[in-house]
Design a protein with these regions (language model features):
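N-terminal signal peptide c-region/cleavage motif recognized by signal peptidases
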Residues: 21-23
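Extracellular/periplasmic metallocenter environments
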Residues: 27-32, 79-114
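Asparagine-centered strand-capping/turn motif at beta-strand->loop junctions
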Residues: 57-59
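Short beta-strand/loop motifs in extracellular/secreted proteins, especially
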Residues: 53, 63-65, 107
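Hydrophobic helical h-region of N-terminal Sec-dependent signal peptides
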Residues: 11-15, 19
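Bacterial N-terminal signal peptides that target proteins for export
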Residues: 2-11
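N-terminal edge beta-strand
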Residues: 27-50
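Beta-strand-rich interaction surfaces with strong enrichment in secreted/lumenal proteins
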Residues: 43-45, 73-77, 87
Length: 114
């Protein structure tokens, strides 16, 4: 059995960690990509290097699409008329291609970290 004073201390520690976590995420810069007519807009997205970013992918099409990148090690299906959040980085300076696997002929783009 855990003494009540230890339980209170653990509860305070867990609560403090939970309250501190959202502020760390809020400090990350956010960028938006829109999927429209099976294309990513913008096709090229410039982001800061060495910084973790929040990427908001909005699918304006009625059909699902995927945000996928081998170089970023990310794969996320976004249902039609919805959005998803993908966290990326920190990235070394460079170019990172991404694509939509369901419409590979048109859904292409790249992230440039500078």
């Amino acid at each position: 059995m855990i003494p009540s004073s230890l339980r209170r201390g653990l509860a305070a520690l867990v609560l403090g960690a939970a309250l501190a976590a959202p502020s760390a995420v809020a400090d990350e810069p956010s960028f938006e990509l829109v999927i429209r007519d099976h294309k990513f807009e913008p096709e090229t997205l410039e982001v800061p290097a060495d910084t973790r970013i929040k990427l908001i992918v909005q699918n304006a099409d009625p059909t699902p699409e995927e945000f996928e990148s081998y170089e970023l090690n990310r794969e996320k299906v976004i249902p039609g008329n919805s959005q998803a959040i993908v966290y990326i980085g920190p990235l070394d300076p460079g170019t990172y291609p991404f694509f939509g696997e369901f419409h590979m002929d048109t859904a292409q783009g790249r992230i440039i970290a500078e």
